[in-house]
């Protein structure tokens, strides 16, 4: 069984990896992937904490977090598809410039 420290440390590393990628990347699709990594890191922390205290609440919250992440990802991908069809780019810097 994995210890609480190691599980939370892995979750922290994944969260920092996602946050760093979110800050560094300029492509909206990669930013969405970074957000998904961060959400999965938080869900991992819930499962590890629930397992440590022998409570099933962490696993129930994990199921909730995964369903929320799936719905968020599907809506975001639909919006990204429409954005790409209109602008022909997913670069956040090109999209933030005003066209007139």
From Swiss-Prot:
Its EC number is 7.1.1.-. The chain crosses the membrane at residues 4-24, 28-48, 60-80. GO terms for cellular component: NADH dehydrogenase complex; plasma membrane. One of its GO terms (molecular function) is quinone binding. Keywords: Cell membrane, Membrane, NAD, Quinone, Translocase, Transmembrane, Transmembrane helix, Transport, Ubiquinone. It is found in: Cell membrane. It catalyses: a quinone + NADH + 5 H(+)(in) = a quinol + NAD(+) + 4 H(+)(out). It comes from the Bacteria. GO terms for biological process: ATP synthesis coupled electron transport. It is a multi-pass membrane protein. It is an enzyme of class 7 (translocase). Belongs to the complex I subunit 4L family. PANTHER family: NADH-UBIQUINONE OXIDOREDUCTASE CHAIN 4L, NADH-UBIQUINONE OXIDOREDUCTASE SUBUNIT ND4L. NDH-1 shuttles electrons from NADH, via FMN and iron-sulfur (Fe-S) centers, to quinones in the respiratory chain. The immediate electron acceptor for the enzyme in this species is believed to be ubiquinone. Couples the redox reaction to proton translocation (for every two electrons transferred, four hydrogen ions are translocated across the cytoplasmic membrane), and thus conserves the redox energy in a proton gradient. NDH-1 is composed of 13 different subunits. Subunits NuoA, H, J, K, L, M, N constitute the membrane sector of the complex. This is NADH-quinone oxidoreductase subunit K. The gene is nuoK.
């Amino acid at each position: 069984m994995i210890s609480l420290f190691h599980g939370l440390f892995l979750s922290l590393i994944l969260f920092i990896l996602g946050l760093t990628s979110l800050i560094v990347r300029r492509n909206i699709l990669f930013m969405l992937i970074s957000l998904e990594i961060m959400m999965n890191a938080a869900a991992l922390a819930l499962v590890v904490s629930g397992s440590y205290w022998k409570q099933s609440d962490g696993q129930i919250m994990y199921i909730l977090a995964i369903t929320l992440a799936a719905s968020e990802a599907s809506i975001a991908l639909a919006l990204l598809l429409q954005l790409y069809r209109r602008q022909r780019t997913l670069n956040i810097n090109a999209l933030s410039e005003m066209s007139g």
